[in-house]
Amino acid sequence: MELILGSQSSTRANLLKEHGIKFEQKALYFDEESLKTTDPREFVYLACKGKLEKAKELLANNCAIVVADSVVSVGNRMQRKAKNKQEALEFLKRQNGHEIEVLTCSALISPVLEWLDLSVFRARLKAFDPSEIEKYLESGLWQESAGCVRLEDFHKPYIKSSSENLSVGLGLNVEGLLGALKLGAKLSSL
């Protein structure tokens, strides 16, 4: 069965590649600005459901589509993608030395199965080096990440402790997705 990643995220694409999952990447447009909630869990769930509805429009026989959305929560305050460098700096100041949560809602739809998962990755952070913050902001890497969180590079050396489910922190529950894909394969062979 052909798998489509309904996301432009290079991090999500890399996660699938690292797990040996073959896929085609296609952008799905869903207007997250239409969501009025400020609750991080509700927001990420509704954004993923919206993307899932868009995916249903693309769904063809013998095709499965995976979508996901992530937000960061610091003290239950939602951080989405920063709109500019000043907002990025404010996000990083709130995260500095605190616990962050990356809430990721992942979903799969196929002709035989619909799977949706909301998971949380938690990390306790050490204080950021101010000169590294400046370099990070200048690099522009923060622009495509919810809450400017990049566990694969900038945030990595500052993690004091974290939960085990790193793929959730990177934006896709790969372990859950693998289980859903196996179940889907079994169901389609019946």
UniProtKB/Swiss-Prot annotation:
Species this chain originates from: Helicobacter pylori (strain ATCC 700392 / 26695)
GO molecular function, one term: nucleoside triphosphate diphosphatase activity
Named cofactor requirement(s): a divalent metal cation
Keyword annotations of the record: Cytoplasm, Hydrolase, Nucleotide metabolism
Domain of life: Bacteria
EC id: 3.6.1.9
Keyword Hydrolase: yes
Major subcellular site: cytoplasm
Residues at the catalytic site: 69 (proton acceptor)
Name under which the protein is recorded: Nucleoside triphosphate pyrophosphatase
Family indicated by similarity: Belongs to the Maf family.
Function comment: Nucleoside triphosphate pyrophosphatase. May have a dual role in cell division arrest and in preventing the incorporation of modified nucleotides into cellular nucleic acids.
Location(s) in or outside the cell: Cytoplasm
This protein's record includes keyword S-adenosyl-L-methionine: no
Catalytic activity: a ribonucleoside 5'-triphosphate + H2O = a ribonucleoside 5'-phosphate + diphosphate + H(+); a 2'-deoxyribonucleoside 5'-triphosphate + H2O = a 2'-deoxyribonucleoside 5'-phosphate + diphosphate + H(+)
InterPro entries recorded: ITPase-like_fam, Maf-like
Biological processes per GO annotation: nucleotide metabolic process
Gene Ontology cellular-component terms listed: cytoplasm
PANTHER family (alphabetical): BIFUNCTIONAL DTTP/UTP PYROPHOSPHATASE/METHYLTRANSFERASE PROTEIN-RELATED (PTHR43213), BIFUNCTIONAL DTTP_UTP PYROPHOSPHATASE_METHYLTRANSFERASE PROTEIN-RELATED (PTHR43213:SF5)
